[in-house]
Amino acid sequence: MEALSGRLTVLREFRTTDLDDYLAIAGDDRVTTWMAFDSYDRAKAEQSLAAIVARSAQENRPDYMLAVTRPDDDRVIGFGRIAPSGSWTAKLGYAIGADHWGHGYATDAARVLLGFAFGPLGRHRVTAAIGPENEASIGVVKRLGFTYEGHLREHVFTNGAWRDSLLYSLLQPEHTD
């Protein structure tokens, strides 16, 4: 798959050589406190990255888990995911390394992923499930025009406890970018 470019980010396929950058994100409690998984150690990150690379090679891939980089630097600063769910819908997810928060990278990467979901993937609806305390991520989807749909109680188990999620969605006709 060709890389997808935004104003601030480039989303490309992961490579096994991205392990150190991937671990710096997926192994950081500041990041994973907002994710649906606990922080990875090196072995778990290596296993996860190998699975991501393997899925990207499948003809009918189950998801598009892409590395987020900057246009002037190929180092991974985050990841974004579009996971088709059903014929016309997809789930959106993203994470940016804590050292890169506050620069618009998550919003830009999510915008790029939405263009991919509504364009080449032909999706009608994209959803995002976000922890109620994750104000930064809620801000991302609001900036992109998502609509709040509801509160999912004890939706994910992570970091040793059940966590609620807020469900947001965007329909293709509402997508403006």
PLM regions and their residue ranges:
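Acyl-donor (CoA/ACP) binding surface of acyl/acetyltransferases
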Residues: 1-30, 67-177
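A short hydrophobic/aromatic micro-motif that marks alpha-helical segments and, especially, helix-coil
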Residues: 14, 42-43, 56, 175
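Short acidic-aromatic low-complexity motifs
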Residues: 17-19, 59-62
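Alpha-helix initiation/capping motif
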Residues: 38-41, 57, 130, 161
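Short loop/turn motifs at secondary-structure junctions and domain boundaries
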Residues: 56-61, 146
